[in-house]
């Protein structure tokens, strides 16, 4: 169990924090520990629900880099709820745009981001992407 723990902490870039009390970790570090804990169960699917929403903008990249690594190096399906549109476009095989609890549009990242068909999707992307 200890070897698995150390391997997972290394995977999320926190092996140097193995003796640290959780309260002394930053929000981004705590989120990466949470990801490592989930991976300990060897899941085939992970649900990631707004994993960066409560983080300082300066540490969002730490968490997104862990997800990038998992996406490239592990046979793992990830279902992610996010407002990080650039990141979603970069790593996704399929994207769904939800509004008021309903799927308004879905497709490949290229289809949805570069050529949205639904008017609400167009409005959302215009507002979000122009803000960034």
Name each model-derived stretch.
Residues 20, 41:
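Conserved signature/switch motifs of ABC ATPase nucleotide-binding domains
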Residues 21-25, 29:
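Conserved ABC ATPase signature
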Residues 82-83:
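H-loop/switch region of ABC-family ATPase nucleotide-binding domains
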Residues 106-107:
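ABC ATPase "signature
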């Amino acid at each position: 169990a200890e070897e698995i723990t150390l391997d997972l902490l290394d995977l999320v870039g926190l092996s140097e924090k193995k003796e640290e009390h959780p309260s002394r970790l930053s929000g981004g570090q705590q989120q990466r520990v949470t990801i490592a804990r989930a991976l300990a169960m060897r899941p085939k699917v992970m649900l990631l629900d707004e994993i960066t929403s409560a983080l300082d903008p300066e540490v969002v990249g730490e968490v997104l880099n862990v997800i990038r690594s998992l996406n490239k190096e592990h046979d793992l399906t990830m279902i992610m709820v996010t407002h990080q549109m650039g990141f979603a476009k970069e790593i996704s095989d399929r994207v769904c745009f939800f509004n008021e609890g309903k799927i308004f549009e879905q497709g490949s990242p290229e289809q949805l981001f570069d050529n949205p068909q639904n008017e609400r999707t167009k409005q959302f992307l215009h507002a979000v992407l122009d803000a960034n």
